[in-house]
Amino acid sequence: MSETNQQRDDLPAYLNDEPPADANKDHPQPQPGMFSRVAGGLFSVTKGAVGATVGGVAWVGGKSFDLTKTAVTSVASVPAMGVGLVKGGVSAVAGGVTAVGSAVVSKVPIGGGKKKDKSD
């Protein structure tokens, strides 16, 4: 038994099974069910997150996927699970379909866009 304990003590800290005591010192965990304002700086997206835009400010509920970029939620509908239409920014998918980015493509026709027929 004492030989096994001695082997554990000889291992470097990064090989130990136990996490360090100050693991969350620099990155505190956001509270579940809270809303984070997405307007520059840190934001979070939760599994099955729902986003909304109110007065030009995007809001995304929850936690678990942290980024540090300015983000705007995509106002276009998403054509398939896990596909986001975001131009020149950051996109993230967490559980459901959530697209965020620094610039959203405006007026993007998706799928069944209105096509002119011969009578027009």
UniProtKB/Swiss-Prot annotation:
Recorded topology in the membrane: Multi-pass membrane protein
TM region positions: 40-60, 80-100
Keyword Transmembrane annotated: yes
Biased composition, class Basic and acidic residues, residue ranges: 1-11
Keyword Cell division found: no
Database matches in InterPro entries: UPF0444
GO CC annotation, single: membrane
Entry keywords, A to Z: Membrane, Transmembrane, Transmembrane helix
Coiled coil: none
S-S pairs: none
Subcellular location: Membrane
Region ranges (Disordered): 1-36
Main function: May play a role in bone development.
Entry's family note: Belongs to the TMEM263 family.
Cited PANTHER family: PTHR31443
Protein name: Transmembrane protein 263
